[in-house]
Structure formats: structure tokens, C-alpha cells
């Protein structure tokens, strides 16, 4: 399978190595990527604490033309210049209250998260649809349901072999392999309550515009789980490290 290098360059990245240099602290870098004034568009830039001292750079948007520009920057500034083994993104979906479609789409690479509120957009973003089925490899959990949701909501299929289910890579020896249990074993113990600490009432608000701060933070942390686990898989495999209480299945 393909894996992701933590030091890969991205349109959001101000330093050349996430592991050795500090991330930028100003949202001005984010807005400099956009062809619009940040005062005239419903876009927010923020930092979210994932765990410990690990900060996430998060962009929240609900305009399709902004997402199109982001994907163009992503391709030109990062994807086209990355090595094959670095072309790996996290993919996550949040659902509306009736569970019949997609409310929010998240893309993540390294510590940088795009949250696109599909439910509040004009639902006309062919560039995003093309990006999803362009052959890029995505990491996720519960991919069978995701495939059904994308087929129903977008009428698209991510190519076979381009959507990797992390639950087929990792198996916990003493716990069921849920997202929370995997995050505790592979990333940090603080992820143990990431599901239960998020109020159930907020799950009904993924279509609310703008999203509440708690929803944005939850989406960012949940989504970064995918790329963090992928990076952990890569580092442990390359270094022949045995993960405590975790079996690597491939």
C-alpha cells in the first residue's frame, strides 16, 4: 500500500519538516492562497489541538469555488511534486440528521485539514468529484458505508484499490478495533473519549451553517486519526517496530 511522509510539502505548510520545525502561527498564510478577500467569504482558519502539543491547521469552507481553488493549489504545490509513496490523503464524511446523504467532507494531509460543508454549498463542485476519483489513495474507516454514501450523494465511485480501510491494516489484540480504541493504541490516550465527549445532539447539526466550533474541532480530530494511523503504520513498518497490543495485518 502507499503511505504518507509527515514531512511532505502542502499548500498549508509553512515549514519544510513537520517533525523538526515549528508550524506557522498566523492564518494569513492560509488566506494568501485564496483569490478572494477573507472578509467577503465564509471561510475560517484556525488551529485545533489534536493531542499533547500537536496542533492542526484547519480550514473550514462552504463555497464550492473556494474548494476548487484549494484542490488546484494542492495538486500544483504538493501532489504533482510528491514521491509516489507520499501520495496518501485522509478522507472522512459526516452525515446529516437523516443519515441519507453527506453533510461534510474532510480531506487531511499531515497536520492540515480541509473541512468542506457540502450541505451548505451549492453542491456543484466537479473539481472535487474528479479529485476523489482521480486515482489518489485515501485512508479511512468504514469504507463500505462511505462508498455507498458517495455513490448516493455524488454519483461517483472511488477507483478500486484507492480507498484503504484502516481496520483491515490494524487489529487490536485485547480490544475491538473501533476508531477510538485504535487511536488510543496508535496515537495518544486522550483519544479514548473522542466519541463519548462529543454531545450526541451535535451530530444532528452537521447541516447547520456555519458549523459550531465544537463540530469543527471534532471533525478535525476525527479526520486526522486517519493520517496519523497511516503515518504510524509507515514508521513502524520501515523501522521494524512492534506496536504494543497491535497486529499489523498486511
List where the protein language model places each region.
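Acidic two-metal-ion nuclease catalytic site recognized across multiple nuclease folds
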Residues: 220-221, 225-250
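Conserved DEDDh/DEDDy metal-dependent 3′-5′ exonuclease domain
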Residues: 57-73, 84-89, 95-232
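N-terminal accessory regions of nucleic-acid-interacting proteins
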Residues: 2-14, 18-89, 166, 239-250
Amino acid at each position: 500500500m502507499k503511505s504518507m511522509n509527515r514531512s511532505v510539502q502542502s499548500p498549508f505548510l509553512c515549514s519544510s519538516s513537520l517533525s523538526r520545525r515549528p508550524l506557522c502561527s498566523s492564518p494569513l498564510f492560509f488566506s494568501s492562497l485564496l483569490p478572494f478577500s477573507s472578509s467577503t467569504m465564509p471561510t475560517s482558519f484556525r488551529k485545533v489541538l489534536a493531542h499533547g502539543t500537536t496542533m492542526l491547521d484547519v480550514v473550514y469552507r462552504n463555497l464550492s469555488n473556494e474548494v476548487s481553488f484549494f484542490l488546484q493549489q494542492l495538486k500544483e504545490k504538493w501532489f504533482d511534486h510528491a514521491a509516489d509513496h507520499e501520495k496518501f490523503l485522509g478522507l472522512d464524511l459526516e452525515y446529516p440528521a437523516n443519515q441519507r446523504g453527506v453533510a461534510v467532507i474532510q480531506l487531511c494531509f499531515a497536520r492540515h485539514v480541509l473541512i468542506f460543508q457540502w450541505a451548505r454549498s451549492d453542491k456543484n463542485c466537479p473539481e472535487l468529484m474528479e479529485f476523489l476519483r482521480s486515482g489518489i489513495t485515501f485512508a479511512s474507516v468504514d469504507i463500505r458505508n462511505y462508498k455507498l454514501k458517495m455513490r448516493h450523494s455524488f454519483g461517483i465511485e472511488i477507483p478500486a484499490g484507492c480507498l484503504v480501510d484502516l481496520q483491515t491494516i490494524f487489529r487490536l489484540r485485547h480490544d475491538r478495533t473501533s476508531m477510538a480504541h485504535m487511536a488510543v493504541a496508535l496515537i495518544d490516550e486522550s483519544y479514548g473519549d473522542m466519541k463519548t465527549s462529543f454531545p450526541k445532539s451535535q451530530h444532528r447539526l452537521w447541516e447547520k451553517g456555519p458549523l459550531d466550533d465544537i463540530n469543527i474541532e471534532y471533525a478535525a480530530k476525527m479526520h486526522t486519526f486517519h493520517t496519523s494511523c497511516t503515518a504510524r503504520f509507515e514508521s513502524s513498518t520501515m523501522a521494524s517496530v512492534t506496536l504494543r497490543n497491535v497486529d499489523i495485518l498486511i
